[in-house]
Structures are given as structure tokens and as C-alpha cells.
Regions:
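Short beta-to-alpha loop/turn elements within the nucleotide-binding domains of ABC transporters
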Residues: 449, 466, 500, 535, ...
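Alpha-helical transmembrane segments and immediately membrane-proximal extracytoplasmic
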Residues: 1-448, 452-458, 462-474, 484-486, ...
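Conserved active-site tyrosine of GNAT-family acetyltransferases
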Residues: 560
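The conserved cystathionine-beta-synthase
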Residues: 462-483, 490, 507-512, 530-557, ...
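Generic long, charged, amphipathic alpha-helical segments
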Residues: 357-379, 508-529, 533-536, 543
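Bateman (tandem CBS) regulatory domains
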Residues: 447-461, 466-473, 504, 516-528, ...
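Short hydrophobic beta-strand motif reused across regulatory alpha/beta modules
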Residues: 391, 497-505, 563-571
Length: 592
């Protein structure tokens, strides 16, 4: 009998990373994806400005328009209502994938859609977002741009023969390019892709995403501008206990994140109880947005100018309080309705407003500094991406001095949210659709352990010279050693000749055999799957699945002599052992 064994078990073939020349192909494709993402970001910004000017100022212009100091008439309440009605119609008759803030939809495409996004999403998502935001929706442009950039990356990938994992890489690359073009934060965009979208840390995905983000930052001076989006130069010199104060700000930000997320999904549940089709929900939310705009126009639209004012320390306490309350209410009500908009800018604005309020009781630092720290902490806690939020704040402002304060605040906020909430604002939506995912990256024990660590030995085997009648008697008697469904068969030298099971014996009994026929003769020269002691457990498990076998004989690589056996239960024990090591708490060193 011939043996089918792994050719990948040798240490000479093992590497830290599973990269190959496909990495270069994906990196080349990412050059195009980065360009797509950058231009998509520019297009969406212009569309938002066009709709804003047309809806509020009755001017057909693509130049950026702010609503912060607009003098709105009571009739302006109907502008967000009309915008919500149009978005609802697009969602129902165009594509329901435009609903939401973009990132959960991109995650769903990655997890269950094999990283395929429909072409119409690339059209309707930016258009619906421009209408929603341009008519006063209290959203950022980054979520829709991430979804649009991801859609373009996915569509581009579908023109080539790529695997689902490779399409995922280009989807994330397009998303990173869109975020980079808006904010000028390539490193944070790459980290966002890693912390939230890719679900892996591999050169295959990391390098193309970096390429795409760098291409986008190269386009940015011509499309958006070369300067940091929000300039900041007010970082104080922290006393030794200053980082503790930053941690306290982070804890408050974590509580704010938990409250905001809980409120969002509570309001969404109330919408679902309404006797109205979801198409009408954005229009209904538009009424609340319109009233909020009359109270504080600064809460409407993208609000990048408000973020700059908060960071610059130009917002008074009462204005920050009004902005926080109005922005939080209209954002939660509007986003829960299923309209199209982003989360990053609103989170930054609400976090910054709380930071301004905190600055009046904290012992050092201006309101702009604490607004910036609180912004990053709220972002890191709500999205559960503390590294992204930290680097994002530094790149966004161009102020490296804030790094220690930001990272401790983001870590504290992250710790609070993971302890208080089961899921983030991104994953809760997926969980409600029956999709659970985890963001914990650990070393796979199947990749670390070798077959020798889990194989059963010594092994009870049947000899090839055993007669068929004797073999049948072995399976029928149920002797003490006979407690498995299948057994290896070995020749006189101990080399594996095959595997024989109860099912085989039943089939052969029906077929009949010659009186003098042996097991070895019956097995003949058919191929048998074997493993080697030095093989990785993961490799062996993959081959067992492919061959649909439950037990594999383990042989010495050079001699072919049987030395062990691996069954499915041995593989399950590997997972059980990993869980046991995670849960065990042992004192390794004595204190005295």
C-alpha cells in the first residue's frame, strides 16, 4: 500500500509568515485601489458640499459650506426630513446596503459575503450619504467613504482571479485609502484596517493596505490639501501625576462610549416597534434633526470646523454643553433610523465637547488639550481600536507631544468599554443579525504543536498476514484491546500497509473472500494517509479534513515504521488544552 504523507513538515520549509509572490501582485493592485479610494473621498466631499449649499443656501456650488453659524428659519426643519425621505427611498429601491454607517456593512461583506460588494453599493452609498449629510444629517463622511473605498476595492478585485482573502485585502486597502484621503492619517488608516477589518496580521494584507494608504496620501495635496486636518500646538508639560489624570479622562470617555452605544441600540429597538416600514424612519428622524438644528446649528452636518474650534480652545463651556446634548440626541436618533452616515466625526465632536467641560475642573492644561484627549479616548473606546485612536490623534493634529497622554486615555477608555459592554458599536449590529465575531488575536495551538505532542502511542495494530477470517473475528469478539472503529495494518517490518475499520469488514463480508486471503492482500496497493511526528498538528488536521478520515497512522519519515496514531479526539484535546492554559492561574514563583 502506498502512503500519502505531508511534504511540509520539515523545519526547513517553515517560516514566520506565509508570504509568497502573490504579495507583489496584491501590492500592484493596491496602487490602483489607493487611487480609487482617494478620488472617491474627494468626490463624496464635493457631493456633500454641493447638497449643503443647495439645500441651505440655495447656491449650486461644490465649495465647502459650514452650518455652524447659519441663521435657520423654522421651515428649515423640513430639509432633513426631505433628505431622510430620499435616503429611505434609495435604501428600499436602490440598495439596502446603504443603511448604516458603513463599517459594519464592510465587516459583513468580509465575514459572510466572501469580500464581494455589489457594484450598485459603490454608487448608492456615496450618493445617499451626500444627501443625508448635506441636508443636515449629523454625520461624518469617513464611514461612507470607508464603505465606498472598500466597495471600489472589492469591485476592482472581482475583475481578477483572486481568493476571498485576497479580495478582503483590497477591500480593506480601498477603505484605508478613503480614510487617508479625508484625514491625512495613513498610519491610523492602516491600523484601523488591522484592528477592525482584516481579522489577521499577515504580510499578504498588511503590505497592500500600506501601499494603498501611501498612494492616497500622495494624492491628498492635490485633492484635499497637504496640511493636517486639525492643527494643534497646545500640549502642556505634564507633571508626574498627569498621566493619572489622563487615565481618569479615559475612564469618563469609556463611560460616555458605553452610554452612547447603549442609547443608539435602544433607540433602534424603538424604531422596530413602529408600525411603519423602515423606509420612513430616516424621514421621521429628520424631524428631530431639524428641531435640533434650530436649537444649535453647529450640530448639523459634518462639523469639521467645530472639531477644529474644540481643539483650538475656542468653544465656551455653555456652547460645548449645548453642542454635546444636541449632537448626541440627533446623532443617536438619526443613525438608529438606518440612514446613511459616519461615526468618526460625531464621536470626535461629542468627546471633544466633554473634554471642554472637563477642562474647567482639571488642574492643568487648556480646554483644547483636554478636548483632543477626550476625542481620541471616546473614539478608541466606542470603536474599540485604541491604537488607531492614539495614532489618529497624533497624525490628525501633527502634534507628537500628545502621544503619552492620548495612549493612556485610550487604553483606559478601551478597558472600561470591554468590561462594561459585550460588543462595540460596530459588532453589536452584526450580533443582532446573528453574526458573532471576536477581535482577540492569539497564537493558534495547531500551528505551534507537533504531531508527536498529541499522538497516541504505543499503537495496537493488526498484522498484514492476519487472515480475513481472523480479522473478522477480531472485530466481532469485542476483546479488551478492540475498542476503536479502525486500526492500522502493518507488515512484518512494522511499516503501515493500510487502515481497516468495522465498516470495511462488513462490506468485505458481503462481498466474500478467499479462505486463504490475508488483510495485506485485501488492502492491496491503495493509498493511505499517514503523518509524521514532526508535522504540525494544523497540517495534519487539514489533510484529515480533505481526505475525510478520522484516524491517521503516524510513521517515521525515513523508515516508515508505525510509531503512533492521531484521531479526531486528539485534535479536540489540543483545543481543550489551550483553553485550560488560558483559565489556569498558577503561582510560578514563591515570594519567600
Amino acid at each position: 500500500m502506498k502512503s500519502s504523507a505531508s511534504t511540509h513538515g520539515s523545519n526547513d520549509t517553515l517560516r514566520d509568515f506565509t508570504a509568497d509572490r502573490r504579495l507583489l501582485v496584491l501590492s500592484a493592485l493596491a496602487l490602483v485601489t489607493g487611487t480609487f479610494g482617494a478620488w472617491a473621498a474627494w468626490t463624496l466631499l464635493k457631493l456633500i458640499a454641493l447638497v449643503t449649499n443647495l439645500a441651505y443656501y440655495h447656491v449650486l456650488s461644490p465649495h465647502t459650506a459650514s452650518l455652524s453659524h447659519a441663521h435657520l428659519a423654522p421651515s428649515s426643519i423640513m430639509i432633513p426630513v426631505i433628505g431622510g425621505l430620499i435616503v429611505g427611498l434609495i435604501g428600499r429601491y436602490g440598495s439596502n446596503k446603504i443603511r448604516g454607517h458603513g463599517i459594519p456593512e464592510a465587516l459583513e461583506a468580509i465575514l459572510i459575503g466572501q469580500s464581494r460588494i455589489e457594484p450598485k453599493v459603490a454608487l448608492w452609498k456615496p450618493l445617499s450619504s451626500a444627501i443625508a449629510i448635506g441636508t443636515g444629517g449629523p454625520f461624518g463622511a469617513e464611514g461612507p467613504i470607508i464603505m465606498t473605498g472598500g466597495a471600489l476595492g472589492s469591485l476592482f478585485a472581482q475583475f481578477f482571479r483572486l481568493s476571498a482573502a485576497e479580495r478582503k485585502t483590497l477591500l480593506a486597502a480601498g477603505a484605508a485609502a478613503g480614510m487617508t484621503a479625508i484625514f491625512g492619517t495613513p498610519v491610523a488608516a492602516v491600523l484601523l484596517a488591522i484592528e477592525i477589518m482584516l481579522f489577521e496580521w499577515k504580510p499578504r494584507s498588511f503590505v497592500p493596505v500600506v501601499v494603498s494608504a501611501v498612494v492616497a496620501i500622495a494624492w491628498r495635496p492635490w485633492l484635499v490639501g497637504a496640511w493636517p486636518l486639525f492643527a494643534h500646538r497646545g500640549a502642556p508639560v505634564l507633571p508626574w501625576w498627569g498621566l493619572l489624570v489622563c487615565a481618569l479622562v479615559g475612564v469618563i470617555a469609556g463611560l460616555q462610549s458605553a452610554l452612547t452605544t447603549g442609547a443608539l441600540y435602544w433607540v433602534e429597538e424603538q424604531y422596530e416597534k413602529l408600525p411603519l416600514h423602515w423606509m420612513w424612519w430616516p424621514a421621521l428622524a429628520g424631524l428631530v434633526v431639524g428641531v435640533g438644528g434650530l436649537i444649535d446649528p453647529a450640530a448639523l452636518g459634518v462639523g469639521y470646523d467645530n472639531i477644529q474650534a474644540l481643539i483650538s480652545g475656542n468653544v465656551l463651556m455653555h456652547a460645548a454643553l449645548a453642542l454635546l446634548i444636541v449632537k448626541a440626541i440627533i446623532w443617536v436618533v438619526s443613525l438608529a433610523s438606518g440612514t446613511s452616515g459616519g461615526t468618526l466625526a460625531p464621536l470626535l465632536m461629542m468627546g471633544g465637547a466633554v473634554g471642554v467641560l472637563e477642562a474647567h475642573v482639571l488642574p492643568f492644561g487648556g480646554s483644547g488639550f483636554w478636548a483632543l484627549i477626550a476625542m481620541a479616548a471616546v473614539l478608541g473606546g466606542t470603536l474599540r481600536c485604541p491604537l488607531t485612536a492614539t495614532v489618529f490623534a497624533v497624525e490628525l493634529t501633527g502634534d507628537l507631544r500628545i502621544m503619552p497622554a492620548v495612549i493612556i486615555a485610550c487604553a483606559a477608555s478601551f478597558a472600561v468599554t470591554v468590561l462594561l459592554m459585550r460588543r462595540s458599536i460596530l459588532t453589536e449590529r452584526l450580533a443582532r443579525r446573528g453574526r458573532h465575531l471576536t477581535y482577540e488575536y492569539t497564537v493558534d495551538p495547531f500551528e505551534v504543536m507537533r504531531v508527536r505532542d498529541i499522538m497516541a502511542h504505543p499503537v495496537h495494530a493488526l498484522v498484514a498476514s492476519l487472515s480475513m477470517t481472523g480479522a473478522r473475528a477480531f472485530f466481532e469478539t469485542g476483546s479488551g484491546v478492540q475498542r476503536h472503529r479502525s486500526y492500522p495494518v502493518v507488515d512484518d517490518a512494522g511499516r503501515v500497509a493500510g487502515m481497516v475499520s468495522r465498516a470495511d469488514m462488513l462490506r468485505w463480508s458481503r462481498e466474500g473472500w478467499r479462505d486463504v486471503e490475508t488483510l495485506g492482500e485485501r488492502l492491496g496497493s491503495a493509498e493511505v494517509l499517514v503523518g509524521h511526528p514532526e508535522d504540525r498538528v494544523g497540517d495534519l488536521a487539514d489533510r484529515m479534513i480533505a481526505a475525510d478520515v478520522g484516524r491517521v497512522p503516524i510513521v517515521e519519515r525515513t523508515s516508515g515504521v508505525l510509531v503512533g496514531l492521531v484521531a479526531r479526539r486528539d485534535l479536540l484535546r489540543v483545543r481543550a488544552l489551550a483553553g485550560q492554559l488560558e483559565r489556569e492561574r498558577a503561582q510560578l514563583m514563591s515570594l519567600y
